[in-house]
Amino acid sequence: MALEVLEALDSARTQWYHVTAIVIAGMGFFTDAYDLFCITTVSKLLGRLYYFDPSTGKPGKLPNNVNNLVTGVALVGTLSGQLFFGYLGDKLGRKKVYGVTLILMVACAICSGLSFGASAKSVMGTLCFFRFWLGFGIGGDYPLSATIMSEYANKRTRGAFIAAVFAMQGVGIIFAGLVSMCLSAGFKASYHAPSFHDDPIMSTQPQGDLMWRLVLMIGAVPAAMTYYWRMKMPETGRYTAIIEGNAKQAAADMARVLDIEIQAEQDKLAEFKAANDYPLWSNEFFTRHGRHLIGTMTSWFLLDIAFYSQNLTQKDIFPAMGLIDKDFEMNAIQEVFETSRAMFVIALFGTFPGYWFTVFFIEKLGRYKIQLIGFFMMSVFMFIIGVKYDYLRNENSHMFALLYGLTFFFANFGPNSTTFVLPAELFPTRVRSTCHALSAAAGKAGAMVGAFGIQNYTQKGEQKQIKHAMMILAVTNLIGFFCSFLVTETKGRSLEEISGEDGRESELTPTPPNNRVPTRQEPRSETM
């Protein structure tokens, strides 16, 4: 059984409102990526500015615990925000809490740049406080954007639309490198300084304190630009009909968006809801969806260990690849410029294409195949880097850069995209946002393993440590490959068919007997 409003959404041709939804939701992910990854470009500058000790004879460096907090605290906030807003998205509505996440992102991006204090410790403490709440807002964007896009899209292009929203993360990473590169180039040209080797004191320009603040605050701009349009979006038809039980409002909203006439079918909706009223934490849910939830959570957890380790430790690996000079050969702002430039190049030629390959091929190859291919290829390239690390570092840095870039490509033309898409499709409407939040939060738990574990291990930039880290990540990706067998293909099917909400039984989403949709000839069974 399918409601007319749901069939209309599934069969709708691609229209302008689909494009606007992608842009509005996608700009949130642009901001998310920019805010999460721009800290990588300026963290070494923070060390030079606030933690320089002349007695060491080396440029200032953030202590391990401070570095882990500055780069990783936003991930803790993101995990918390995913669970909080994901739950509210199912209880209050996707739209009602969608604007709150954006307000948090704008306010905390600005406040991060205004971090204050009389000592280095207090400045870093204030920065960490605001970046936690920045991450909290970012976290809410994950389940809400994915759920909204999946519920707006038609079944033929749903995967491509959700992937396109997520692909804006790649644009955000590029801009994190580009903005830092442009600002540091301007400051470098305006405020000349010797290298650390020539003058340890004068090599750190005091104007760098303004520069890192500008880098962080610029993240507020794209989010602020989309707030009005985000508030103008109607609630999704699936939420209004299936969760609120208001078939008339759902039909009216979607008829206006699709520019067609849709019947309300309130009586049919009552039967639909009665067949799907089991709670999230129930035996019935785990019978029907437990395997998929375990699959989406474990694969995202393992993927983010590798993905965030790569992104957050780039600044430590770039010197080993020969992409930037040694720190004592540069002044503070020059180091930001070279780190940002290397990050921009890797993102432009490795990260960015992978996202859009997924957009273009997800409806042809399917989510499942792309995820398996991505995990496997990441494991292969990281294993090669780990085994041949000494040769690549000392004799063939260009091949090192190519292999490293390919790991980013197959992360994004692979599990980094599909782990975002699949939880938005596999689960029933009334728990879709929560299940996506649980999967995404598992991912951020993996990101924290990368940020606090792998990053801490590689921070000194020693060859042996980076080599071992690559081997660990290769094994992590291989485990992710096998965990991917717990999920299933969703392309070309309606959300209700995938989740079993329409009453049809499938091999992968069994419908327990007491939850069959009652016909007019038989009495309805008691619902558990």
Swiss-Prot record:
GO cellular component, one term: periarbuscular membrane
Induction: Induced in roots during development of arbuscular mycorrhiza (AM) upon colonization by AM fungus (e.g. Glomeromycota intraradices, Gigaspora margarita and Funnelliformis mosseae). Induced in root tips by low phosphate (Pi) levels.
Membrane topology summary: Multi-pass membrane protein
Cytoplasmic side: 1-18, 90-96, 144-158, 230-292, 363-371, 423-433, 489-528
Single Gene Ontology MF annotation: phosphate transmembrane transporter activity
Keyword Membrane found: yes
Region called Disordered, residue ranges: 496-528
Reaction(s) this enzyme catalyzes, per UniProt: phosphate(in) + H(+)(in) = phosphate(out) + H(+)(out)
Family: Belongs to the major facilitator superfamily. Phosphate:H(+) symporter (TC 2.A.1.9) family.
NCBIfam families: 2A0109
Note: Although related to the sugar transporter family, it does not transport sugars.
The protein's name in its UniProt record: Low affinity inorganic phosphate transporter 4
Species name: Lotus japonicus
